[in-house]
């Protein structure tokens, strides 16, 4: 069977086994993608009216969020057989599924990092506990295939890839603006992707994540990462850059964000404000997300500062970037592609290399199906952004998943939690979240 025949076969199977979602909601509710609103046109007018542009810097007040819920979760999709070229062909065959083209363009512009294979080997841990920390499939692969070290992260790297995607899109927004779409400033895009090449020379490579995870987070190579370990790796790797353009604030063991601590990172010693990524690690229930948090979680993706959610799927991790009513749109890292090479000259990256980091294929998951353990991210670019974000956090309908206070009690030796913090949100530790977020 030729490669072309195999591609057609994969798309044929995918069409029936893993269908792409269509915009079949009856309420005509808008779609939100990282703080941008895409209205849904009436079907009778779609042939005569083009899609409305996204509303810049505008998001719904919490009180106006849709309250109607679908009674039956829509079909979710797990795994895929698509290739980057196959994705484009499948898109053409299925038209746009009723989705606004402006939303699809925005979705496709997001950097999508997935499992990779045939990259320089990541050495195995010599710790006797390392083998037992792996899943059975990864353990067998390490003994039968990757005997000289891990040359693929298939089966264990999904949370790392979700975290990489989150960080890459934060850098994309910071460097190129929220309005960037594919086909513009391609060299700048290549520079960002080169930071995530599957090579130890790349500062945000999977090799660097695994290295820091082993040295500081108790994670062995081949072991699943959770949101907490991923957040700590993002912070450490960003801080290790000589001229870091982005600083990182993590909430640690709770969902409380403290202004004094945040400002000490964003503008230490009262220096100029440096754009700062806020990473909130939380667990919003035991097995499923508790309904009192639904509106707040949906609202988090409507804020202009949002750069998405990593995690949130039982037995796997995804990167969520959009929401419509109670359906969340995500990029799925569970597709193994050839390693993204490291290039000294970014102009040497091929179109195929770049295309492998984008997709126009939508995936959708109802909030009822999401795992409660996750990493919620926001990019704060200046002090005005901070003030606007802090104000928006207070306007959330229902129980909030993020709380902002002026000062960190620990800074004054008080060592106490904010009153009611434990009752409001159940947070995670690595021992808990890694049993939920497999690869």
Curated annotation (Swiss-Prot):
* InterPro entries (alphabetical): Papain-like_cys_pep_sf, Peptidase_C54, Peptidase_C54_cat
Q: Which residues form a coiled coil?
A: none
Q: Which GO terms describe its molecular function?
A: cysteine-type endopeptidase activity; protein-phosphatidylethanolamide deconjugating activity
Q: What is its EC number?
A: 3.4.22.-
Compartment(s) of residence? Cytoplasm; Nucleus; Preautophagosomal structure
Residue span of region Disordered:
48-92
Gene Ontology annotations of biological process type: aggrephagy; autophagosome assembly; mitophagy; piecemeal microautophagy of the nucleus; protein processing; protein targeting to membrane; protein transport
List compositional bias (Low complexity) regions by residue number.
Answer: 76-87
| Polar residues: bias regions | 64-75
Q: Provide the catalytic activity annotation.
A: [protein]-C-terminal L-amino acid-glycyl-phosphatidylethanolamide + H2O = [protein]-C-terminal L-amino acid-glycine + a 1,2-diacyl-sn-glycero-3-phosphoethanolamine
Q: What class of enzyme is it?
A: hydrolase
One Gene Ontology cellular component term attached to this UniProt record is: cytosol
Q: Which domain of life is it from?
A: Eukaryota
The residue ranges crossing the membrane are none
Q: Which UniProt keywords apply?
A: Autophagy, Cytoplasm, Hydrolase, Nucleus, Protease, Protein transport, Thiol protease, Transport
Q: Which residues form the active site?
A: 158, 332, 334
Tell me which Pfam families the record gives. Peptidase_C54
**Location, primary (coarse class):** cytoplasm
Q: Which family does it belong to?
A: Belongs to the peptidase C54 family.
Q: What does this protein do?
A: Cysteine protease that plays a key role in cytoplasm to vacuole transport (Cvt) and autophagy by mediating both proteolytic activation and delipidation of ATG8. Required for selective autophagic degradation of the nucleus (nucleophagy) as well as for mitophagy which contributes to regulate mitochondrial quantity and quality by eliminating the mitochondria to a basal level to fulfill cellular energy requirements and preventing excess ROS production. The protease activity is required for proteolytic activation of ATG8: cleaves the C-terminal amino acid of ATG8 to reveal a C-terminal glycine.
* Protein name from the UniProt record: Probable cysteine protease atg4
Q: Which organism is it from?
A: Botryotinia fuckeliana (strain B05.10)
Tell me the name of the encoding gene.
Answer: atg4
């Amino acid at each position: 069977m030729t490669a072309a025949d195999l591609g057609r076969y994969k798309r044929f199977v995918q069409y029936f086994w893993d269908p792409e979602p269509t915009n079949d909601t009856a309420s005509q509710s808008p779609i939100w993608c990282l703080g941008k609103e895409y209205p849904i046109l009436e079907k009778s007018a779609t042939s005569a009216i083009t899609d409305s542009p996204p509303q810049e810097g505008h998001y719904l007040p919490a009180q106006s969020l849709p309250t109607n819920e679908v009674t039956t979760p829509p079909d979710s999709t797990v795994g895929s057989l698509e290739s980057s070229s196959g994705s484009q062909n499948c898109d053409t065959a299925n038209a746009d599924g009723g989705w606004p083209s402006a939303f699809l363009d925005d979705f496709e512009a997001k950097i999508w990092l997935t499992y990779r294979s045939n990259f320089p080997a990541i050495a195995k841990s010599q710790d006797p506990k390392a083998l037992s920390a792996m899943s059975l499939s990864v353990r067998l692969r390490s003994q039968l295939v990757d005997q000289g070290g891990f040359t693929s992260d298939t089966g264990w790297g999904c949370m790392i890839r979700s975290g990489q995607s989150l960080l890459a899109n934060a850098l994309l927004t910071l460097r190129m603006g929220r309005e960037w779409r594919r086909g513009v400033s391609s060299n700048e895009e290549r520079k960002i992707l080169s930071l995530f090449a599957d090579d130890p020379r790349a500062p945000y490579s999977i090799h660097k994540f695994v290295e820091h995870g082993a040295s500081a987070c108790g994670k062995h190579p081949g072991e699943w990462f959770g949101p907490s370990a991923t957040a700590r790796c993002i912070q450490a790797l960003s801080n290790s850059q000589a001229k870091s353009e982005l600083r990182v604030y993590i909430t640690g063991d709770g969902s409380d964000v403290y202004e004094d601590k945040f400002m000490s990172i964003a503008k230490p010693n009262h220096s100029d404000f440096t754009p700062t990524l806020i990473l909130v690690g939380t667990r919003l229930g035991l097995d499923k997300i508790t309904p009192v948090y639904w509106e707040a979680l949906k609202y988090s993706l409507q804020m202009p500062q949002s750069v998405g959610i990593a995690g949130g799927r039982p037995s796997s991790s995804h990167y969520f970037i959009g929401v419509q009513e109670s359906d969340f749109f995500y990029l799925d890292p569970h597709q193994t592609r050839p390693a993204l090479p490291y290039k000294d000259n970014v102009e040497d990256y091929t179109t195929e290399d770049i295309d492998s980091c984008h997709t126009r294929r939508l995936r959708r998951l109802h909030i009822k199906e999401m795992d409660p353990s996750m990493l919620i991210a926001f990019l704060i670019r200046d002090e005005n952004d901070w003030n606007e974000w802090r104000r928006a956090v207070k306007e959330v309908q229902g129980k909030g998943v993020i709380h902002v206070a002026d000062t960190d009690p620990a800074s004054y030796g008080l060592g106490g939690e904010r009153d009611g913090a434990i009752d409001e949100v159940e947070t995670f530790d690595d021992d808990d979240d890694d049993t939920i977020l497999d690869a």
